[in-house]
Amino acid sequence: MAVLRLMLRVWIVLLFAGVGSVNAIQVEVAPGQVLQIHPSDAAIALDGQLNESIWTELDHYDEFVVIEPDTLIKPSHRTRVRLFYNDRGLFVGVEAEQPTTTLVARLSSRDNRQIKRDNIGLVLDTSGEGRYGYWFAVNLGDTLMDGTLLPEKQFSSDWDGAWEGASSTTSSGWSAELFIPWGIMSMPKQSGERRIGLYMERFVAYLDERWSWPALPDTVPRFISALQPIAVQDVTPKQQFSLFPSTAITRDRIDGETEYRLGADLFWRPSTNVQVTATVNPDFGIAESDDVIINLSATETFFPEKRLFFLEGQEVFTASPRADTRGGGVGNRGAPYTLVNTRRIGGKPRLPVLPGEGEIRVKDQIQPTDLLGAVKVTGQNGQIRYGFLAAFEDDPEFLVTDDAGTYRMVGEGSQYGAARLLLEDKPGGAYKSVGLLSTMVLHEAGDALVQSIDGHFLGANGKLKIDAQAFTSDKEGIERGYGGFIDFEYALKQGVTQRVGIEYFDEAVDVSDFGFIQRNDNFRIRQSHIRTRSDLDWARSNQFDFRGFVQKNAEGLFTQGGLFFSNRSLLNNLHELVFRLDLLAGAYDDLNSFGNGTYRVDPRAMASVGWASNRAKPLSFGGKLGYMGEELGGDSSVMSLFATWRPNDRLSVDAMLNYLNRKDWLLHSQGSTMGTYAAEQLAPGFGLEYFINAKQQLKLVVQWVGVKARSGSAYEIPDQPGDLMRRPDLDVSVRDFSVSQVSVQARYRWELAPLSDLFVVYTRQSNQAGLLLDRSFNEVFQDSYQAPVTDALVVKLRYRFGS
C-alpha cells in the first residue's frame, strides 16, 4: 500500500512538472458562473507575443463554439483566453491555434469590417446590466477595430477609443494581446465588486467561420443581456484627461488661398460615469470623402457620420434602432429615421436671400460650413443616462455674380443643441426604458425645435422586442407637426424572426434641420420575415428575407407599396450567391413633381442575381445582372463587376464598374411637365491601399458617376391626382442632359500614437450638370474634372496629451 501511495505522489509530481507555459490549467465554465478575474500589476509589452511570465501563471478558458454558421459545435482548432486586470485596465491574451499555412493577415484602415481575415474580438458590457457596451477587435497584422453596443445587438463602428492591441504569428498559429483602459469606457459609479459582461469572438478566415464564447449566434434574440459575467474588485478609474491640440494647413487651389488653422479637442472624464468632450476651431478637411451618388429624386440621400468628435459618445442620442439601418442582413432595411443626424452640423450652408438677380458660385453652395466649436456631455446617474450637445457654426461666405460684377456676401451659420434623458429599469427580468430627446436649431431664417419620447421593451427571454418613438416639430412659419412609429420584433425560433412596424407622419412634421426622415405626410405599415439556416447539405448557410409595406398620404392616396424577396447563400466552396425580386404596386407619386402635383405610376418589377467568389482569397471578384421596370412601362437593365486583389497583407487594389441602361426613365422637367429619357449611367471606381506598416497608410480612391440622358416624350401633370397626360407639343421642352460627379482623394496617415495622427490629404471633387450636347462619356468626364468645386491639399497634425 505504501508503494502505491509513493507511485501516486510521483505521478502527480511528474504530471504538474510537465505542464508547460502554453498548457496552463484550463478552467471549465459552468452556466451562470461568475468568473473572478485575477488582479496583477505585471508589466506587459503589447507586442502580441504572450512571452511575459504572467501569461504562464494564469488559468485559461477555451469555451468557444462555432456560431457562423450557427452549428454550435466545437471548433476544429483551440483558442485559449487569459485575462487579468489592474487599476489601469483589462488585459487579454489569446492563443489561436491553426496551421500556419492557413493564416490570413491583411492590413487596412481602422474599423474595416468588410475584409475577411483572422481576428480576435472582445465585447464588454461595462454597465453590468445589459444596458450598453463596447466592442474591440485586433486583426492578424495589428489593424484595430472598435465601436459601441446598445441593447440587444445594435453594433456601431462610430467610436474610436484609446486602447492598444497587437498580434504575432507563432509556430502553432498566432496570438494577440489587448489592453483596454477603464478610463475610455462609461461605467456606473460603484465600489467593491464590479460585474462586467464578457464576450469573446474569433474569426477564422480560411474556414470562413466565426467562433464565440459564450455561444451567441446572430440567429438567437439575446446578446448583450446574455454575456459571460466576470467580476473585478475595487475598479474605480482615476480621472481621465486628454487634450488634442491640432494644426492644419489647407491650400485651396481654386481660390489660390492658404488657410492656417489652430484648434484643440478636449476629452475629460471626471469620474467613471461622466464624460465631457469639446472642440474649438476644428478642421474636418481630412475626413474621408463620401461615396459618389447621383440622386435626381425628391428624397434625400443619407450619409453616415465620419468625424471623430461627433462619433464619441454618440450612442446615448440613439433613440431607436431605426437610427442606424446599416446591417449585415441580405434585406434592404431602408433609410434611417433619426432626430439627431450630426452630419447636419457643419454641412452645406443655408443660402442667403440675394438682394437682386444674382447667382451664388456652386463651390460655395456645397462646401462644408466651418465650426467655431462644440461641446458634449454624456453620463449616467443610477438608472438615468443623459447627454447634452451644442455646436456653433461660423458665418459662411459666398461669391455672388450678377450684372454688376462679382462680390462677396456673408451668410449666417446655425447653432445646434440636443438634450437626451434615458431612464432604464433595474437589472433582472425584462428590459424596459423610456427616453426624452429634444433638439434645437437656431438660424436667422427661422428656428426649428423638435421634442420626442421613446420607449423600449425586451422580454426576459429576448424573444419579444418593442421600440416606439413619438415626436413633434415646431418650425418657424410652419404649424406644429406630429409623427411617430412603433416596431414589434419576435423571434419565433432560432434563425426565424418576424418584424412589424407602423408609422405615421403628418403633413407639417419636419425634423430635417437636425434629423433625418425621407418624407412626411405618410402612414405606413411594414413587415419583414427573416429565416437563416445552416443545416444544409448544399450550402454553408442560407438567409431568406421577405419584406413588404403599404403606405398612403393624408389625402388617402396609395403612394407606395410592394413585396421584396432576397436570398443569400454561402456555398460550400465559400462563394456567395444572391437573388433579389422586388414587386412594386401601381401607386400615386406625390413627391417627384417637386410640388407640382400628383400623378399615377404603373406597377413594376425588379430582379437581379449576384455572385461573389471567396473573399478570403488573394484575388476575389464578382458581379451582378439585373432588370428594372420603369414607372411608365419602360425596361431597364443593370450590370456591375468588381474585383479585389491582395497580393500580400500590405497592398490592396479594388476596382468596380456599374452600368445602368434606362428606357423611359421618368423625371421632372419643369413646372407641370414630366419627361421620359433614354439614359445611360456609368460608374467606375478604383481604390488602392498600401501600408508601410500597421501605423502608416497610403490610400487613393477615385470614383466617378456619369449620366447621359436623351429626351423622349413630354407629359403633363394633371390638376387632380391621376394619369400623366401625353403632350407631344411639349417634347421640345424636354432637353438632353448630362450629370457628372467626380471624387478623387489621396491620403497619407501616420498614427503616431493612439488617436494621434499626421494626415496629408488631397481632395478633388466635381459636380456638373448641363445639356448633353451629344458628348461622349469621356467628354462628360473631362469637362467636369476640369471644373472642380473642391481642389484642396490639407496637412494636419493632431496629438493626444493626457492621462
Can you describe what each PLM-predicted range is?
Residues M1-M7:
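N-terminal secretory signal peptides that target proteins for export/translocation
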Residues M7-V19:
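Bacterial N-terminal signal peptides
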Residues A24-L422, A787:
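Structural preference for beta-rich elements and adjacent junctions enriched in aromatics
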Residues R88-L90, Y132, W174, G192-I196, ...:
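Outer-envelope beta-barrel architecture signal
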Residues P181-S191, I224-D234, R251, P270-V274, ...:
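Outer-membrane beta-barrel proteins
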Residues T236-T277, Y386, Y416-D474, D535-W538, ...:
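Surface-exposed extracellular loop regions of Gram-negative outer-membrane beta-barrel proteins
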Residues R253-I254, D265, S297, Q365, ...:
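Alpha-helix capping and helix-loop boundary segments enriched in small/acidic/polar residues
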Residues D370, K465-S803:
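Exposed, low-structure sequence patches enriched in small/polar residues
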